[in-house]
């Protein structure tokens, strides 16, 4: 049997909300090292990964690795009741799926829900193996604002890096938008191994960057015409990772 307790029901809710932008059904994989879920869109343009490493789980018991397919909306119904930072969430395997308990550690109030789930093997989807020659970290709100501005002008964004600057630009119907990102203006970190350039869908980027607002330390990586990687961590240890395929 499986039992896992995560310290922040609110963060768990935020992470699942990010997944819900891509799919409403996931396989929660329980392994010795972590709880995770991976999903690739049918067009193979976007992959999203939800992960909570074992070290960030307050209580984790697992007899054997197992996947449980669930509907995210069913899980969000109870997680939406977590109004304070002191609320924890516990997942317990049942014969029919999962028992989910949200408990406010300050007040002692508790809510339970039983979710139907199909038990499966661990999914074998793997992340792209590419060399990200450019990485930078910034506040998720900044990325959301940039994506919004890009979407007002064009459908594709070219992201490039050279020397000490990352540039996001789009041009369409005589209109141009360009955003220049540098260390401390507003980047918290910047590493450029070599000049790089790639083009991505603004619509996909906008959807992903809406999710980044849950974190103040979002790390973006890209290279020459390879998938972009966006890592969105939470203070409680859980994270979302997005991979966006380039337009070639």
Swiss-Prot record:
**Quick check: keyword DNA-binding in the entry?**
yes
Q: CDD domains attached here?
A: PCNA
**Which GO BP terms sit in this record?**
leading strand elongation; regulation of DNA replication
Q: What Gene Ontology terms describe what this protein does at the molecular function level?
A: DNA binding; DNA polymerase processivity factor activity
Repressor keyword on record:
no
InterPro entries tied to this protein? DNA_clamp_sf, Pr_cel_nuc_antig, Pr_cel_nuc_antig_C, Pr_cel_nuc_antig_N
Please name the SUPFAM superfamilies in this protein's record.
Answer: DNA clamp (SSF55979)
Per the record, the similarity remark reads: Belongs to the PCNA family.
Q: Which PANTHER family match?
A: PROLIFERATING CELL NUCLEAR ANTIGEN (PTHR11352:SF0)
Function summary = Sliding clamp subunit that acts as a moving platform for DNA processing. Responsible for tethering the catalytic subunit of DNA polymerase and other proteins to DNA during high-speed replication.
Subunit info here reads: Homotrimer. The subunits circularize to form a toroid; DNA passes through its center. Replication factor C (RFC) is required to load the toroid on the DNA.
- The protein's name in its UniProt record: DNA polymerase sliding clamp 2
Source taxonomy: Archaea, Thermoproteota, Thermoprotei, Sulfolobales, Sulfolobaceae
